[in-house]
Amino acid sequence: MGTRGPSAPVDTTPAKTIVVYRNGDPFYVGKKFVLSRRRAATFEALLEQLTEQVDVPFGVRRLFTPTRGHRVLGLDALQAGGKYVAAGRERFKELDYIHIVPRKPAKIRKLKEIKPVVHCDINVPSKWQTYHRISRHINVFTNGRLFIPPAKIIIPKFSLSDWDIVLATIGEKVFPLGGVRKLFTMNGHLLGDSKDLQDNHFYVAVGLETFKYFPYWKSPRVPSEVQQRYANVEKNSQRKKKVDSKGKEPCKYDGIPPKTQDSVYYAKEEKKKTLAEPLVQRGAEGDVYKAPTPSKETQGALDVKEEHNVQLEVPVDQRQAEIVKEDEEIHENTPDFEGNKDKEDARLCEDVERKMAREWKPVD
């Protein structure tokens, strides 16, 4: 029988357990690592193992003690149950790593369902629960087009939160001028939000033009109940208009609109106010402008009469109007050059005819 060779020595060194933190992270809870000679035979192998488990920028390149930040240089310096900080190329950052405690996740608060009052017989869910959870079924007319039947549109529940998306959804089936910009009820009330939409109601989609008041409810697609309701509203409005028109008094200025009467540029009839006092007649007794005695310089002076040969220069606007001859009279006096030319041409033609007649005259 053969003999066995000497067996290899078995390493009986117990494995070490350490806790590793991340450098500069106050929320990172330390991880436990078991150091065995088989997996981490060298310090470089240990750093590679830590790089796989601890997320450090550019990998784990250094180990420090958590309290004073002393650098660990080998496996022999590691103590069983010790705590260390893994870092990359950066410097050690002082934090209280030992007392980092894992935080419990915050509890999600459940919304309590609003229940109706006990003494109330109505058992209806609250509006805030059902508003954005139920889609809307509406019927939409095109503005000003009575002969086009209303389009049935289903607005999804997820689009009710945005009014622009609601209008875009309506614009996929209704095509007014310029696209759907506004939404009105059949009697002309503007809708500003999806909260005003009601199931199975009728609306009018309007684009760039204004809303046109047409009897949309007379369409055969509209239920008879809705038609009767809108017809009653129209009758009541017409009665009110007749009563208001009878009760009004006729206006003074029928031909002039009221805006022009109140305008600054509108001339109003007013009597002239005489602010100046009447002039005092000259020559009356006690007149301040009348000299009490005639002056000596003017006594014996003769009045000089104007001569007829003297010419006075009068301004243009004060001169008498002169009669200007019209162009027709001037044209009559001018010689008729065209007529004379025609006469000369006629004479030349006669002379030529005479010469031709003489040349072709037969000889006896």
Swiss-Prot record:
Keywords, ordered alphabetically: Cell projection, Cilium, Cytoplasm, Flagellum, Repeat
SMART domains named among the record's database cross-references: DCX (SM00537)
A GO biological process held by the record: intracellular signal transduction
Gene Ontology CC terms, in alphabetical order: cytoplasm; microtubule; microtubule organizing center; sperm flagellum
Residue ranges constituting the Doublecortin domain according to the UniProt record: 16-98, 136-217
Domain of life: Eukaryota
Tissue expression notes: Expressed in testis and spermatozoa (at protein level).
Record's keyword annotation contains Signal: no
Subcellular location: Cell projection, Cilium, Flagellum; Cytoplasm
Gene3D superfamilies noted in UniProt: Doublecortin domain
Family matches, as InterPro entries: Doublecortin_dom, Doublecortin_dom_sf
Disordered, as annotated region: 233-255
Protein name, entry field: Doublecortin domain-containing protein 2C
Gene that this sequence comes from: DCDC2C
